[in-house]
């Protein structure tokens, strides 16, 4: 099937339909979900406190500043409490778009991921910082293969992951340690190859 300049295959159309259905389900959940008390707590913090006061409050919370930074302008602009649900849903719709576009999986596996319990309920609907974690984790996976050629992008995603929840710091620390060891191994290998090349040139010159 050809739409505009792009010819769509049947799997692509099925995946597009699955993505559209996923977005519709998320909008339906935003309409009917009744937020829990801790969701309201995060909203009250950004609504009632200044930026310095929020930083002082963080010592009692399990979330670093990033989630509150996203909520703060919504609350200060006078938007209704339900906007936190819209934000959470938008983050996971973005995560779903990255998954659909970049995941090296067959279309039916991607569709199955979209309609899994974490994608449908736990990450977007509960409206906590976990939606932000979902988006950043998928971005991390998408950038993992180019971490050596585009290190700044990969490092930025890892940094943001640390700002989502304290529980993610250990996971990020493991990825950073692995990455550092890989770069060290690449550096040692490059020096050895340079030494071999220099020796070969010396022999040829002699």
Regions found by a protein language model. Give the residues of each.
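Perimembrane helix-loop-helix junctions
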Residues: 2-4, 171-206
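Short acidic/glycine- and proline-prone juxtamembrane loop motifs at membrane-interface regions
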Residues: 125-131
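Transmembrane and membrane-interface helices of multi-pass
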Residues: 108-120, 134
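Membrane-interface transmembrane helices that cradle and orient dolichyl/undecaprenyl
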Residues: 138-153, 183-187
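Membrane-interface alpha helices of multi-pass inner-membrane proteins
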Residues: 119-123, 138-139, 151-177, 203-205
